[in-house]
């Protein structure tokens, strides 16, 4: 019998989405195929420490969030003498070194899905699930992602960008620039956050300054986007021989939530109604699935991503909102739900993502790293 593939489920992270990651990781941990994979839970706590968590006694069936054990040994990532990735305890003797085959990052937000962890794994020559450094970085930045999408001919909603430096230097001028050419309401968003952290719907000029102050708590660059009377449509994309786009879903925030906020997503069990598949005609469904794969390709993504769009109620046109290269995998997350509705069950999806990561790593290892004339 072949040895099992050793999969590190990496969770936690130094970001505002730390708690979301714990929930996603519990679901991934529970659904990875134990006949093929040996699962190794490694957390990143809020101070940035990497720790191996012995969760063999965890009740997988009922764990809503993967814990970070207080006495878990701190580890560092290294390359073993055979070139294989290995986790080594910081304190000698605290744990045995753990050889690994692939890392499944189940982490969200800055210092997690923005290319930083991916760069570390590249340097360690370790296979990992999801997009590489470039795609992770540009996809995380809502401004850069929109610019690349526009360059590829994909419509986006009008928006403006402010930096914290400019805002601090001249608040009056920045407040005017923030809505120049836009009409209220607008949405204020940190450029490099997800899960709707730090997002505000601004309906009056008087509310703009406080919204910007809050958004700048999470990022040095903030996006101010035109509010549109639109439906929120999502598509899951999976890399295979060709790019596969799922059936689209539609998010309908309940009346007491003005938009799909962090509270609506994670704290309110009745925060939104989801239509899966979305109530689109055949032409609209084909159009949005095609746009999703075009965005995925334009940003040079790998593995998987969730692509979000607005469907303008007045014009009937789709416009790109944002892309998530490490989408949530909680019990209510739409990426696995859309894939399941499109014929790819959760467990099979995870296995395919691991296989894609290993294949991509083998391809990169086959490249020449030196040059002799």
Curated annotation (Swiss-Prot):
Per the entry, the cofactor note is: Binds 2 magnesium or manganese ions per subunit.
Start and end of every ATP-grasp domain? 146-355
Q: Which InterPro entries match?
A: ATP-grasp, ATP_grasp_subdomain_1, D-Ala_lig_Van_CS, D_ala_D_ala, Dala_Dala_lig_C, Dala_Dala_lig_N, PreATP-grasp_dom_sf
Q: Which UniProt keywords apply?
A: ATP-binding, Cell shape, Cell wall biogenesis/degradation, Cytoplasm, Ligase, Magnesium, Manganese, Metal-binding, Nucleotide-binding, Peptidoglycan synthesis
Tell me the enzyme class: ligase
* Location of this chain's protein in the cell: Cytoplasm
Q: What residues bind Mg(2+) 1, as annotated?
A: 308, 322
Coiled-coil region list? none
Q: Where does Mg(2+) 2 bind?
A: 322, 324
Q: Does the keyword Cell wall biogenesis/degradation apply?
A: yes
One of the entry's Gene Ontology molecular-function terms is: D-alanine-D-alanine ligase activity
The protein's annotated catalytic reaction(s) are: 2 D-alanine + ATP = D-alanyl-D-alanine + ADP + phosphate + H(+)
Stated EC number for the protein is: 6.3.2.4
Q: Where does ATP bind?
A: 179-234
The GO annotation for biological process reads: cell wall organization; peptidoglycan biosynthetic process; regulation of cell shape
Please give the pathway this protein is involved in: Cell wall biogenesis; peptidoglycan biosynthesis
Query: Which cofactor is essential here?
Result: Mg(2+); Mn(2+)
Q: What does this protein do?
A: Cell wall formation.
Protein family according to the UniProt entry = Belongs to the D-alanine--D-alanine ligase family.
The record's annotation in HAMAP family points to: Dala_Dala_lig (MF_00047)
Q: What is this protein called?
A: D-alanine--D-alanine ligase A
Q: Please name the source species.
A: Bradyrhizobium diazoefficiens (strain JCM 10833 / BCRC 13528 / IAM 13628 / NBRC 14792 / USDA 110)
Gene name of the encoded protein: ddlA
